[in-house]
Amino acid sequence: MDPSRRPPKDSPYANLFDLEPLMKFRIPKPEDEVDYYGSSSQDESRSTQGGVVANYSNGSKSRMNASSKKRKRWTEAEDAEDDDDLYNQHVTEEHYRSMLGEHVQKFKNRSKETQGNPPHLMGFPVLKSNVGSYRGRKPGNDYHGRFYDMDNSPNFAADVTPHRRGSYHDRDITPKIAYEPSYLDIGDGVIYKIPPSYDKLVASLNLPSFSDIHVEEFYLKGTLDLRSLAELMASDKRSGVRSRNGMGEPRPQYESLQARMKALSPSNSTPNFSLKVSEAAMNSAIPEGSAGSTARTILSEGGVLQVHYVKILEKGDTYEIVKRSLPKKLKAKNDPAVIEKTERDKIRKAWINIVRRDIAKHHRIFTTFHRKLSIDAKRFADGCQREVRMKVGRSYKIPRTAPIRTRKISRDMLLFWKRYDKQMAEERKKQEKEAAEAFKREQEQRESKRQQQRLNFLIKQTELYSHFMQNKTDSNPSEALPIGDENPIDEVLPETSAAEPSEVEDPEEAELKEKVLRAAQDAVSKQKQITDAFDTEYMKLRQTSEMEGPLNDISVSGSSNIDLHNPSTMPVTSTVQTPELFKGTLKEYQMKGLQWLVNCYEQGLNGILADEMGLGKTIQAMAFLAHLAEEKNIWGPFLVVAPASVLNNWADEISRFCPDLKTLPYWGGLQERTILRKNINPKRMYRRDAGFHILITSYQLLVTDEKYFRRVKWQYMVLDEAQAIKSSSSIRWKTLLSFNCRNRLLLTGTPIQNNMAELWALLHFIMPMLFDNHDQFNEWFSKGIENHAEHGGTLNEHQLNRLHAILKPFMLRRVKKDVVSELTTKTEVTVHCKLSSRQQAFYQAIKNKISLAELFDSNRGQFTDKKVLNLMNIVIQLRKVCNHPELFERNEGSSYLYFGVTSNSLLPHPFGELEDVHYSGGQNPIIYKIPKLLHQEVLQNSETFCSSVGRGISRESFLKHFNIYSPEYILKSIFPSDSGVDQVVSGSGAFGFSRLMDLSPSEVGYLALCSVAERLLFSILRWERQFLDELVNSLMESKDGDLSDNNIERVKTKAVTRMLLMPSKVETNFQKRRLSTGPTRPSFEALVISHQDRFLSSIKLLHSAYTYIPKARAPPVSIHCSDRNSAYRVTEELHQPWLKRLLIGFARTSEANGPRKPNSFPHPLIQEIDSELPVVQPALQLTHRIFGSCPPMQSFDPAKLLTDSGKLQTLDILLKRLRAGNHRVLLFAQMTKMLNILEDYMNYRKYKYLRLDGSSTIMDRRDMVRDFQHRSDIFVFLLSTRAGGLGINLTAADTVIFYESDWNPTLDLQAMDRAHRLGQTKDVTVYRLICKETVEEKILHRASQKNTVQQLVMTGGHVQGDDFLGAADVVSLLMDDAEAAQLEQKFRELPLQVKDRQKKKTKRIRIDAEGDATLEELEDVDRQDNGQEPLEEPEKPKSSNKKRRAASNPKARAPQKAKEEANGEDTPQRTKRVKRQTKSINESLEPVFSASVTESNKGFDPSSSAN
């Protein structure tokens, strides 16, 4: 029903009997020729009440709404589906009978249900078709189920015909039945029309009889008015009889319902119409799910009044408590005519859409499909055409490509045969290579055999030479074996022939033996000729010099074939005794050495005395020279060549043990040497009363003054520390070899330092006739032993034995543990140190500079010179970091002038301990004396002054009337009263100087009468005021832009600024009190500071620098008075507690054990100073906190010096323990910069020390060694490893500390022997400081590997730890074990050409004494290194320390140096050094390590300078 026509809710039945709308109601006209009816019987009610949803009014069946209960609203799609075009359906008789039977059966069932459920009585059911029933719809309408069962129209058969909507079509049309109908009155004027054929169908279809049908009650649910009733009656559109083909007669039209009722009244027996409304029907309008049956209008949340059926729970006068539930939304029912029209519009729209959209769409689809078919057909045609063309083209192409294919086949065959030929060539090359290798192996075997024969030749030649030289002494010296005589050769070697086997000798061996004998004979003959010629010439010179008699040659026969400990030239029996000229006692092994030297001299052999360092080689050589003078009457001249550091030692030892032998110390400047050369006159030599018997000089001077020494025929040449001639290509070696001397003796503790070539150089130097081929010697011995030491390979023991056999006749080697049982033990301890945090940062930063893997891969194993230098530079930098970070750039401290004399005070307390602050023991050079009488009568009597009359005058009266220091008198003295205002002051009185001191008259008077402490306090305060003026000036300069240029204004501003900065001298407690500004003290009040405080706090650091490093400082002027009270007064003033607090921040009193402030009231000046804090700090407070109890005067920062180096911290602890144990220490370092740091450390610790390095002169060396040996108060001797490790006797020390190890481990061994030698009475301990997990460990490991050869060759010979490093050595120092293994594996994979190129390189890395690396040619290096002095000459000291160099009398030495340079007598090493092209490691890296040749380091001698 239309909501607008709904009756009011308060009277739902108000318009029920309003007949006016009913009378005016017009029956709708039929719109179609098709008869429409209401809902068919398939719209069966499925509601909860179980009723049939079919509305009938006055016998007419109303059309049902086919909407489902599940659906909430009608949509356009549903409207389109529910079309109104219902077509007539034809039903056959059989079909009709079946439907009728089913209808009757359902009617019975529903009748039973109605009887069982009285409130829900059902009407007669409508027949239901099984063809087009609504299956998915729930029956119902908008009228809430009002029931009108049947219409009493006569067309019953047509009414029961099922109808479908437009979407459901049934082609079976039920035929119309033309029987007379029967009528069933159900009461209330409602009559049902029964078809006439019903009785006929009762029996056949088992239908209920007419009498069995009882209709009791019918309920119409919902609200009904006449309007809706008229619409229901009008819905019966077809009342006429249907024909079989579905075309019925048209229904008559009525103007109104009243007219229709009048027309139908004649046909109805009971035309009455009655309507009964029951409570159940009224209640049936309550929606399902309502809480109750009472209707209430309630305002919803959206603000709309809605009707709710509620249940009243509680009711009062002014309130109701109800329970409600929202009813389901009712569906709005449209007008059937509107629905039909809407459905027709939808059909029309559908057709329009079909015409407009679907037809066009299908046309497009058809067109597209047709186009696609066309395209596919064309494509297929193109494919077929292409295939055909390909076949045709292929047929044409085959003849054309035949030549191409033929050429390709030919080319493939050619490549195949080329490959085959190449493989065959490689196979042939392989076979040839194998054949060549086999031939090479045969050649090597043959060559090895030849080498063995040559070696045997050399060994036999050596022994035969020794045998001939030994037997030569038994015969006439003038006789010689004839060269062509064979019999003497067979006679002299009976033992050798007997020793050989009796079997037939090989002709080749026999020939070799013959060559050996003749070669030995030739060598003996040549040596004998040389010796005879020298003796003849010597005799002539002696006769010329009026010698007393002929030579008395005494020889000792016999030899034994023993090891180096007992050489083959050692006689079995000896008559040699200790010479009387030797004022000493020789030990047993020294007597054997003297005996061996005598025997070698008699045989004409030169020898090498290679005893271990410290066994007295110098003593044996001096005893041998005394033996020649005493037994053979040979008084020289003897030439002793030694390093510059031991020249004084030789002179002292000879004068001590052989006072009868005169020495000529040939060293000094050019003028001194010129005077000394006057004694080198052949006419004055060769006799006992000659001017000298032994000339002592250095290697460098010997090469420099070579032309003067060639004139002399030296009877014997002794070379001490003979490793200085280790290179046969050096100028030094060639010069000494060219000297005319009868015999040569080499003294060395390490005859082999770097390689086996050096051993050959020494052997060739002593026996040039035998050892004349260096290549063969190097090929026989050098390779195997060196490879074993470096790489751990197998060592040929037979090869080592052959080397021993060659060395037997010419070398005597003893070690300490074998020959000296009373020598003290030596213990070596390696102390591992940790790197400090600063060192670790430096070390890691330097190590990260380069990647070794990238370096190797980028060069394919080839290391360029520049990259090797870079790597070596990294190694050197890492070593410097391990020693001390300040080696890069020394943090030189600035020192003020300390005007005082510092005496040797007690040892300082341990670092960091807080001890009582005491004065450092310094004393002011200014001392004034006060007579005792003056002190007692004037100074001490402070209360009264005595006059000559004897009457006492009070001090106040005296100062008032007789004080010349009154401010008034001083002012008058400065400004005389007679000078006018406008006149220029031409002069002033006695106190006119005070204006220059910036002192007022009051301040001058105060200082004149105050005590010493008050003067000191005033000076500090006055200095602070001066500093405050500087602050004002700096502040004013920064504010110049805001100030006027007027000077007067600037002065005023400056004065005001100074007044603001000056603290108040008068302070009260009220001024110091904090006053709150509110009811409670704000928490942020402490954060607010004045601008003055901020300014003063900002300059605190700058002020500290001025305070702690003043320009000058001096102890108080010493006052000397013989009065005891004066001494007490001075001491009291100096140690006054408040004065100490002022200087150091606190004062220790006797009442407390710790530092605290004195309890007494401070001096006013101290109060004034304290009031200016934080500008003013205690003068020495910070220094005391840093340095502990040390004196405040320091030129460097020892705390930073110690904490920055882990080694120095370890050394500090070690030296304290050694000092406590009364030990004496030799401290060796390599770099001079490191020695400077150690020297500063010694000064800080107050250790007495001496320092010896390359800058020390010969005289200074002698004096320092002597002082250290005789003075027990000297605790430490600082030495350079290279300058102080040769020939110095320092047995007074029992501890050796290596702060840094040298690149050459031989130098470290020599340094150890400075203390561990004969004359040492204490056990020697050697400490070596090594940083953990650094490059130092690898350097030490490398040295230990090379020391292994020393044990292999001759128990003390071969040490390859030299100053020259190859690329592999440098890289190995920077890599760990894993990386080294990988690098070695990659190096093995290199081609042979690369390895050969690397082997052919003759450049090596040289490390000088300063730790710098240069790349030099190997030949030049050998020549220059062996031509230079291990220690620099005293007359030309070269040191990086300019202060020490300038201190060695530059005025006296400058002319000498100028003359030497003018005469061209500079050292060859220096000349070569300047000309040689060197490459510094710092060219590509940091300039700190510059090694380039400059004026300052020109001619630098690395062997003579310490690092």
Curated annotation (Swiss-Prot):
Sample GO molecular function, one term: ATP binding
Disruption phenotype: Decreased homologous recombination frequency, but unchanged sensitivity to genotoxic agents and efficiency of T-DNA integration. Differential expression of several genes. Compromised ethylene-induced H2A.Z eviction dynamics. The double mutant ref6-1 ino80-1 is insensitive to ethylene (ET) and exhibits reduced levels of EIN2 associated with a shift of the chromatin landscape to a repressive state at its locus (e.g. H3K27me3 and H2A.Z).
Coiled coil (residue ranges): none
Induction note: Not induced by methyl methanesulfonate (MMS) treatment.
Residues noted as binding ATP in the record, renumbered to the chain: D611, E612, M613, G614, L615, G616, K617, T618
Gene Ontology annotations for the cellular component aspect, listed alphabetically: nucleus
GO annotation, biological process: DNA repair
Listed Basic and acidic residues bias regions: 428-450
Reactions mediated catalytically: ATP + H2O = ADP + phosphate + H(+)
Domain called DBINO: residue spans: 350-475
Subcellular location: Nucleus
Domain remarks: The DBINO region is involved in binding to DNA.
Subunit text: Component of the INO80 chromatin-remodeling complex. Associates with REF6/EIN6.
PANTHER family linked to this entry: CHROMATIN-REMODELING ATPASE INO80 (PTHR45685:SF2), HELICASE SRCAP-RELATED (PTHR45685)
Official protein name in the record: Chromatin-remodeling ATPase INO80
Chain's gene name: INO80
